[in-house]
A protein has these predicted regions:
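Conserved beta/loop motifs at nucleotide-recognition and modification sites
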Residues: 1-172
Length: 172
């Protein structure tokens, strides 16, 4: 099993894969050792303070998850960057934001101390429009089920373009 890094930025348009990546992290650290924050209410300083805080119970590892980090301002990113220069050794910081770009200051800061995980839906053509039928085919394939392109396209037409809804239908 690979060693956990100090920080992860989990981003991308493939919301189900982002959710699965976060679940895998939580499973490795433990649900009881996980603290959730929202960037809409918590600043970068708040996130750093949560990482540095000692938990009520002594645990081997802690996970601090901050959702919606694409809403953070420059000062928040700087606070996290400062924290990541000397991160708490027993804490894993997971920053989640579907709109965070790979070349953003936040992604660069996390890349120095941890790992940037980008899960995007496949695109087609120059318009960067998501190729959802292809994505649906991949989802079925990952579950050991073969479907043709027409069936995948029909599912997208029936369910719509929400990847989370499509993933739910594939799981059925």
């Amino acid at each position: 099993v690979a060693e956990l890094r100090s920080a992860y930025l989990i981003t991308g348009t493939d919301r189900p894969k982002v959710t699965r990546a976060l679940r895998r992290l939580r499973d490795r650290v433990g649900q009881e050792a996980t603290e959730h924050l929202s960037a809409n209410e918590a600043s970068g300083e708040d996130a750093a303070a949560a990482c540095n805080a000692l938990g009520l119970f002594t645990v081997e590892r802690r996970l601090v998850v901050v959702e919606d980090v694409e809403s953070w301002k420059t000062a928040d990113v700087k606070a996290v960057d400062e924290y990541l220069k000397g991160p708490a050794p027993t804490t894993v910081l997971a920053l989640v934001g579907p709109g965070v770009k790979r070349d953003s200051a936040l992604a660069k800061a996390v890349a120095k101390a941890g790992e940037v995980l980008v899960y995007d839906l496949p695109t087609r053509g120059r318009g960067n429009k998501a190729d959802l039928p292809k994505w649906v085919e991949q989802q079925f394939h990952e579950r050991g089920i073969q479907v043709d392109h027409d069936a995948a396209r029909a599912l997208v037409e029936l369910v719509g373009e929400d990847a989370q809804e499509l993933a739910t239908e594939v799981d059925k």
